[in-house]
């Protein structure tokens, strides 16, 4: 039978064909409605013209034509709305059919995966992956510790100097100026063996002096 009457159309093709027919019908209705609206404007203009001329019989006849024309316009609008509603329903059916086809494909893919997956083998692979990950994490931690031991003190000192310089720059000072204004230590840091160390100014005194200078700058 199909060879005599052609290939049987699929549901998707039938939906597309009906959708095209509905769209064509809506375009035809729009054109006819626009024609009637133009005719309505012409009738109104003729009614005004006849009324000015005092031809009331003609005015009454054309008024009836105007009422009929407006009713037709309203019917065309309602008809187009109904066709558009049907078109939307067809579009919904098409979307639902596409969703069903997609779900069907996903179901087949999931069934194939379930048949191919071998749980014991996957568990073994995951255990080996976790073990190798732990070894890599341990090696990375040891390497980071070694690098921190080699470079940590220097980095900390550089960061501290940078912070101090930034603070002094914001206050309009330099680190060399403040250090030169600090009290002298009065000798080297080391003391010879058997020699009594001389009294040194405490660090607290130096900090207090620096703090007092900063406070004076803020008041200025």
Curated annotation (Swiss-Prot):
Membrane-spanning parts: none
A biological process from GO: late endosome to vacuole transport
Keyword Calcium: no
Disulfide bonds: none
Topology of the protein relative to the lipid bilayer: Peripheral membrane protein
Chain segments carrying region Disordered: 184-220
Motif (MIT-interacting motif): 208-218
This protein's record includes keyword Cytoplasm: yes
PANTHER family the UniProt entry points to: CHARGED MULTIVESICULAR BODY PROTEIN (PTHR10476)
Function noted in UniProt: Probable core component of the endosomal sorting required for transport complex III (ESCRT-III) which is involved in multivesicular bodies (MVBs) formation and sorting of endosomal cargo proteins into MVBs. MVBs contain intraluminal vesicles (ILVs) that are generated by invagination and scission from the limiting membrane of the endosome and mostly are delivered to lysosomes enabling degradation of membrane proteins, such as stimulated growth factor receptors, lysosomal enzymes and lipids.
Self-association state and partner proteins as the record states: Probable core component of the endosomal sorting required for transport complex III (ESCRT-III). ESCRT-III components are thought to multimerize to form a flat lattice on the perimeter membrane of the endosome.
Protein name in the entry: Charged multivesicular body protein 2a
Gene name of the record: chmp2a
């Amino acid at each position: 039978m199909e060879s005599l009457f052609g290939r049987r159309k699929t549901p998707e093709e039938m939906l597309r064909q009906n959708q095209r027919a509905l769209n064509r019908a809506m375009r035809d209705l729009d054109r006819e409605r626009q024609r009637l609206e133009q005719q309505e404007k012409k009738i109104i203009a003729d009614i005004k013209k006849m009324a000015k001329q005092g031809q009331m019989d003609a005015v009454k006849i054309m008024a009836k034509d105007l009422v009929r024309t407006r009713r037709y316009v309203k019917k065309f609008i309602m008809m187009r709305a109904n066709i558009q509603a049907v078109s939307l329903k067809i579009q919904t059916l098409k979307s639902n059919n596409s969703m069903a086809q997609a779900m069907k494909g996903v179901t087949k893919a999931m069934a194939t995966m379930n048949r191919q997956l071998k749980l014991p083998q996957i568990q073994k692979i995951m255990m080996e992956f976790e073990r190798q990950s732990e070894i890599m994490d341990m090696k990375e931690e040891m390497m980071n510790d070694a690098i921190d031991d080699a470079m940590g003190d220097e980095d900390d000192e550089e960061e501290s100097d940078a912070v101090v310089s930034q603070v002094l720059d914001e206050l309009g000072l330099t680190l060399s100026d403040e250090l030169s204004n600090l009290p002298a230590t009065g000798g080297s840091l080391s003391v010879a063996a058997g020699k009594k160390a001389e009294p040194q100014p405490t660090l607290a005194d130096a900090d207090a002096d620096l703090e007092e200078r900063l406070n004076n700058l803020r008041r200025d």
